[in-house]
Amino acid sequence: MAETPFVHLHVHSEYSLLDGAIRMEQLVKKATSLGMPALALTDHGNLFGTVEFYQEAEKAGIKPIIGCEIYVAPGSMHEKKTTNGGRDAAFHMTLLASDDEGYRNLVKLSTKAHLEGFYYKPRVDRELLAQHSSGLIALSGCLKGEVNMALSEGQQAKAIQTAATYRDLFGKENFFIELSDHGIEQQRRNRAGLIEIASDLDLGLVATNDVHFLERAHHEAHDVMICIGTGSMIHDEKRMRYVPELYFKSGEEMASMFADRPDAIANTLAIAERCHAKLEFGKSKYPDYLPPEGKTREGYLRELSEEGLRKRFGERAMTDPELRERLEYELSVLYKQGFTSYFLIVWDFINYAKSKGIPVGPGRGSAAGSLVAYTLGITDLDPLRYNLLFERFLNPDRISPPDIDVDFCQDRRGEVIEYVREKYGKMAVSQIITFGTMGAKSVIRDVGRVLGWSYGDADRIARMIPNELNITLNGIDKKGKHEAGAIDKNPELKNAVENEPATAQLWGYASILEGLSRNSGVHAAGVVIADRDLSEYIPLTLANDGSIVSQYSMSPLTDLGLLKMDFLGLKTLTVINDAVRLIHRQTPDFNISSIPMDDTASFDLLNRGESIGVFQLESGGMTATAKRFQIEHFTDIIALIALYRPGPMQFIDDYVDRKKGRKKIEYAHPLLEKICSETYGIIVYQEQVQQAASALAGYTLGQADLLRRAMGKKDVEKMAKEREVFVEGCARVNQIPAKQANAIFDFLEKFAQYGFNKSHSAAYGLISYQTAYLKANHPVEFMAGLLGNEINNTDKIATFVTECGRMGITILPPDINRSALTFLPEELPGGRAIRFGLAAIKNV
């Protein structure tokens, strides 16, 4: 039997934080299964989930209708007060974007509500609605809507006047009286009044269900979630409650409820038919870097790159054809893909930071594979010397935005962000929102509290959940994919759930709520930059500290073509900078960027396990592994950082045995020797997979990057096709038999799943080496720098003071006449010491 045609126009997802309990994929799947041609998303006061909703709906072949249940202030949105006991602090109204202008207006309204009208809730007012009403369809709202509120108070005339005001504001054809029936007495009392108003004012009626959860059976779990959000207990009598009817009903159920008003059902389809707002993906919204007068961006980038090439390589810049070819190739890709401005923008703010003495990291992620980045000073590692690939950073065969993340001194990172704000406009730059979710252990404790469990009882169950990254209760992730969950991995937990009724109840609720978004936050490093006021593109909100934050998270911003950057704060850069400043007191020309990369004392320090304070190498496990490695070259540090991770750790024993000659090094094909010799025949890096595919099967390095990605994702169907291409390529280019080619493909596939980005490992390995060098060659200054950056951490100070003792460095006590705020080197007749800093003394 065909479903009755109907479209839900008032729906809340998990982004109505701790109020809606529906995951986006499941929401769209439900609408599709019921044969609905379209679906709206109208979260409370925000557009957080818009892009995810739109993409899921498009993927499923269902029309997405972008909307929001807004809050309308009773007077001016700038007036921060309530009347009538606070009940009318803000009225609810459902807005839907009928076209692109409507979407832009919805974005503006949401932004201004958060940035200017926030008072308990993000609010707009009638004046603002009038300015941004074009392209919007408005529904009068739920029981908390202004028309409904007037009717609930017995003020029919006021209700009519309110409806007439909004009719005039939006236009008669764009304002509908919203009808719902959740079995609530007040709704039934208001129903006749709403129908009368619609008749008197010649307005359409529309049926909605104010959906908050997917199935009727989810009502109790949703009730528990409401208690989590309000800090209530399930047995509290005077708490917020939702009725069981707010689930995603079928068209048939809705038509049955509104059998007397088929027009209200038909209007859902009519409204859906009118809505065709589109989101624009992919088109760049990057700001254009303004070069000096008379110069083009492309010309200026080339000029800076040529100048940097000469500074970095001296005479070699003129005589080495490999350098010239690589530079020309990278510039041509940047020009072709339209990322000239991007590189200039990054160069500009890094150049600013360095000019102000703000320490900048040597590189991060795949950007270290770019020669242009090296010539511009964006990175500080020669990609040719360490065989780093540009295609791992920017693939000429796959146009996708580059991703240059930058580490700055933790204390002064904010100065760089402020510079970017001033340069491109305060409203063109914002931080990026994140969403905290209800994790496996936390949701057990939250639900336990709501159900009245003691902390100890709930904690008993939570502790049974294995301490594994991304563990889920039942092995079902947010996208509905199945794998082994906590209940499969711990028999004790399974027994408790199966044999303890109270635990089974808790587990049932927690399983429904697990993974839902519970709060918003601010990304620790992410910044988005646009070519104009961001609210022309995306909705904005405010962080607790008053800074502007995007309402869309990282991935949607990238999909929409906005420039996303990570400005990370790295304490180690501050330590290095402080140590170098102290070294300059005795050695003014010391330059950390010019230290030799083959310093035996640095390697010996690591091989003895004296790595306390050495970046990335100071954990017990890493220290022990470094001793086993017996580091002889900087490349050993790069490999160590790449291997010491979950997954590739399984290859460490094999790596060490081959390195020490205890195991024969073998290669699946002679061409792999050049690629894998530095890692003793083991594929450690993602770049090695690319190089192998290129050398053996004739892939371009860009095509090989796509192969590497496919291998890493374990896409069975795609891998079968790639295997054919690889085997054919091996035969064509190197006459490798199919059997051997298949074996090589299996070999590459095995390691591709664990391979690490060599560019990142090399860049962070450089910081590791620099800290080891400072500790080995300038121990007093380095330890003073470490201590000075842990002023408020007594445990760390104790660790470093003990380490100083082991190193033979005396720690002098605080002295009001000799101590500074921080830890400083001090000369003694018998050597050098460190004077304790006054700021590290408790209560000083």
Residues of each region from the PLM?
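Alpha-helical scaffold/interaction cores of sigma-54-like transcription cofactors
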Residues: 1-844
